[in-house]
């Protein structure tokens, strides 16, 4: 493989579906501009078409109430061009048919966003420069400052200069209010936010009282304040299932090494295991039509499971990166050692490829099928994927 072949290697993510339509994010390297290009593709009536591309990056698509309404984040692309603005602007757009409307814009990054239950508002999680840095013109050239010497042990690297905030945005009027100020509450990052029976609930990171490490907490937003629900674990991917708050992660952060799993969180802050006997890492969970689906790791693969009925939806030598639902159909982003990212329709455990995202790459680069082998060392068993050669392979 030549290094320039990577120009045609596409990484797929953020697959969403509604009605008969799919939208996916595709990211690839660009050696000419020394940056990454992120685009959106849309599948309607069985055909894929470029949805958003150009001089900016487009990411994190979400459907509105109607099938023809799609929200997405637009970010100015980082390139080695001194004539371009040094400010990083992130914007949420709403596209209904051919009409494009700007909903929200901020200097910094938009980590995530979600629509309110009534569809009238939007909750936006941002990662912005802390107040001490906001007046510095060229922030990328500013030297590093360490607030805490053991910053390498907080699992986040150098995070001295950003704080996370939450905005509530009226989609029709575009007016917004900052309901969580990360500067005043010293919130380093917000992993997840969900609206449900407890109102708005979020998982977030703050330094502990000694400033030696980050603590991951879950709290409910009440009048711009955060009422702490739980602070002993390491959790994200908040969601409601059967009218109860759930999360994916560990009940106690120092239980590692152990499996990340689905946890149920009561109104009083008690945390219990949803699947106590399931001994695999669960990495993502989502509820669709009252059924809980999750991705879990097993022997070097990532598979999709119906957690409500305790049924594996696929048992192949593939890694499922993401999944989405479209009417009564299930679609996944899957890859293997010999097949880079593609989108497949999943039906009765069988995968049918419906995309050609990496067709150009696989024509240029020869790939190999790897074999799975569990090797017994006498003291432990090791899951191995490889190309076994020689007469004793």
Identify the function of each model-found stretch:
Residues 15-21, 60-69, 113-121, 192-199, ...:
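Blade-terminus and WD-like Trp-Asp/Gly-His loop motifs, strongest in beta-propeller folds
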Residues 39, 127-169, 215-217, 352-357:
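Predominantly five- to eight-bladed beta-propeller fold
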Residues 70-132:
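Hydrophobic or amphipathic alpha-helical targeting/insertion segments
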Residues 33-39, 80-90, 132-134, 163-165, ...:
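Structural motif
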Residues 4-38, 189-191:
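Beta-strand-rich domains and repeat architectures in extracellular enzymes and scaffolds
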Residues 23-32, 71-81, 123-129, 156-160, ...:
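Beta-strand C-termini and the immediately following turn/loop, strongest in propeller blades
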């Amino acid at each position: 493989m030549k290094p320039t072949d990577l120009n045609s290697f596409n990484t797929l993510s953020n697959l969403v579906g509604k009605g008969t339509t799919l939208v996916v994010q595709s990211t690839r390297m660009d050696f000419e501009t020394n940056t990454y290009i992120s685009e959106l593709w849309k599948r309607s009536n069985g055909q894929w078409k470029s949805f958003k591309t150009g001089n900016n990056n487009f990411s994190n698509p979400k459907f509105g109430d109607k099938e023809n309404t799609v929200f997405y984040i637009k970010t100015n692309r980082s390139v080695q061009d001194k004539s371009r603005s040094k400010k990083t602007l992130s914007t949420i757009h709403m596209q209904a048919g051919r009409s494009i409307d700007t909903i929200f814009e901020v200097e910094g990054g938009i980590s995530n966003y979600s629509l309110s239950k009534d569809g009238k508002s939007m909750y936006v999680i941002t990662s912005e420069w802390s107040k001490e840095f906001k007046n510095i013109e060229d922030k990328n050239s500013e030297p590093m400052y360490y607030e805490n010497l053991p910053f390498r042990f907080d699992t986040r690297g150098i995070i001295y200069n950003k704080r996370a905030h939450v905005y509530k945005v009226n989609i029709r009027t575009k007016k917004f209010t900052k309901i969580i100020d990360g500067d005043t509450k010293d919130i380093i990052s917000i992993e997840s936010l969900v609206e449900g029976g407890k109102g708005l609930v979020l998982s977030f990171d703050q330094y502990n009282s000694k400033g030696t490490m980050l603590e991951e907490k879950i709290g409910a937003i009440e009048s711009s304040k955060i009422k702490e629900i739980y602070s002993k674990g390491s959790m994200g991917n908040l969601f409601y299932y059967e009218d109860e708050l759930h999360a994916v992660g560990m009940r106690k952060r120092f239980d590692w090494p152990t499996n990340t799993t689905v946890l149920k969180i009561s109104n009083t802050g008690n945390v219990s295991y949803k699947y106590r006997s399931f001994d695999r890492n669960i990495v993502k969970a989502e509820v669709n039509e009252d059924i809980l689906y999750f991705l879990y790791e097993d022997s070097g693969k990532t598979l999709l499971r119906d957690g409500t009925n305790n049924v594996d939806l696929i048992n192949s030598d593939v890694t499922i990166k993401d999944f989405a639902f479209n009417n009564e159909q299930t679609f996944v982003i899957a890859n293997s050692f010999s097949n880079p990212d593609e989108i497949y329709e999943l039906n009765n455990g069988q995968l049918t490829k419906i995309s050609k995202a990496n067709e150009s790459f696989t024509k240029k680069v020869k790939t190999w099928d790897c074999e799975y082998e569990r090797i017994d060392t006498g003291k432990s068993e090791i899951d191995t994927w490889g190309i076994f050669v020689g007469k004793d392979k």
